[in-house]
Amino acid sequence: MPPLTAPLTACIALVSLAIAFGQKAPAAKPAPLVKILNRFTSPGVPVLGPAESDVTPRKWDKPAPSGLPGNGMAQHPMLYIGEGYNKMLLVNNGKVAWTYSTGSGFEYDDVWMLSNGNVLFTRMQYVAEVTPEKKVVWRYDAPAGTEIHTCQPIGLDKVMFVQNGLPPKLFVVNIKTKAVEVEHDLPAPSLTDKATIHAQFRRTRYTAQGTYLVSFLEMGKVVEYDKNFREIWSYEIPTPWAAVRLKNGNTLITDEKDILTREVNRKKETVWELRPGDLPEPYRYINTQSATRLANGNTVVCSRGTEGKTPQLVEVTPDKRVVWVLQDWANLGPATAVQILDDPGIPERPGDSQH
């Protein structure tokens, strides 16, 4: 093998340095979702689709503070949703490029863009999949007295979701054949008290190993079940809003009450943790609900914020260096969940998207 040239050696060194500091190394190929974003701004996309309902204008108008790390709304293309503002936002090239409004009521909690461009989301009263042109291709309405806060695509033809209720149930539905392939009752703090329904669950994920990772928000634990719903792993934490199985085998958990994001291993040892107090004061957030682990090792934390007073998104490196703070209440509402669209992977392939 001939010796490396100086420019190539320098390039390799820069890539290694970028990886070491949790920054993006040059990608070998574009992320698949980036290639389809032009569909959302094509001439055939209506401002308000036939199934949409307009929302009350946002009440936050404070401009973004100057000098925040990163590139504001231009840092990443992303799908962005938040409790308290029923308008889903697709951000691309630093601006809102597409929206999906769902009227009054509660609440956006989970969102996925699929590799075919469709968007799967929960809206508490229902779970639905829409095209970039805002055509509804599938929808399931929660029965009276139940709620849906979490969903996940499994391939392009199946959807997993949890229905809070008495009892709560986990479903896997084939949206093409309409067949219910899985319907399983989940534990709950009460099977008779309607007041406990809302706080039962916010996040459940189907893993690359074919298991179900369930966050019991009110019961204070994250439980992993095998395909037959036998418990194979659990972790106690006061109010787990979300948990995602990482590609390294660890589990990334966000706790709403303690405002923390914690990575634990199979032995239940904490290997990484982030709290607002770990950050410089101007970058501190409150009301954290979900978090995303990017392919470069960075973590993006979502916050409902304080109506314009604190950041909505914060991205940190593994050593907790802040590389991006998004505080833009003039254009965006609270951040409950975000899907970073320039991250590699096929979202509907379990385990590819760590959000």
Question: Where in this protein do the model-derived segments appear?
Answer:
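Histidine-/acidic-rich catalytic cores in large beta-rich domains
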Residues: 24-355
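N-terminal secretory signal peptides that target proteins for export/translocation
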Residues: 1-4
